[in-house]
Design a protein with these regions (language model features):
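C-terminal catalytic "cap/lid" subdomain
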Residues: 1-164
Length: 164
């Protein structure tokens, strides 16, 4: 459950970054979290989208035993998203863990089938299978790079595209 709350804190941080540039933001969660977030519903999210508000989905599914990766894939499917943008601690998808293998090779592009077959640790297996079944592509990029969110939004990113 700490992981669920950590995603709420991360969304608050990123939301404030966006707000400081004048953008409207909202954070939706599957559970009540004080006055900082609102309870997720597809209708509420769509109202925010129609209003030009950037919506952050935090808290995973709200249930233990499901990763926050699974939660975000679920929300993307529910919202008929075009793709999922994942800001991670590493800057893309690698053939092995770059933290333990300095020779790890980064993919510029890889299919979700390959991710599943090679058991690459981009997102957990449940979330990967959901992406495959619902044809949901991913864009994986490093959050630690300067301007990474803006660069990714503008199509200039140093990450990996996961195709379906």
């Amino acid at each position: 459950q700490i992981g669920m709350l950590a995603t709420v804190m991360n969304c608050i941080y990123v939301s404030e970054m966006f707000r400081s540039t004048g953008m409207k933001t909202a954070i939706l969660t599957p559970f009540m979290c004080g006055s900082v977030t609102e309870l997720f519903s597809k209708d509420l999210a769509n109202r925010y989208f129609e209003d030009g508000t950037v919506v952050f989905f935090a808290g995973g599914t709200g249930h233990p035993y499901f990763s926050t990766d699974t939660g975000i894939v679920l929300r993307a499917i529910e919202m008929d998203a075009d793709a999922i943008y994942l800001a991670k601690a590493i800057d893309g998808v690698y053939d092995s863990d770059p933290k333990t293998n300095p020779a790890a090779k980064k993919y510029d592009e890889i299919s979700i089938d390959e991710v599943i077959n090679k058991k690459l640790a981009v997102i957990d297996m449940t979330a990967s299978v959901m992406c495959m079944e619902h044809k949901m592509p991913l864009v994986v990029f490093g959050l630690n790079e300067k301007e990474s969110i803006v660069n990714t939004y503008n199509g200039n990113f140093n990450g990996t595209r996961v195709t379906v």
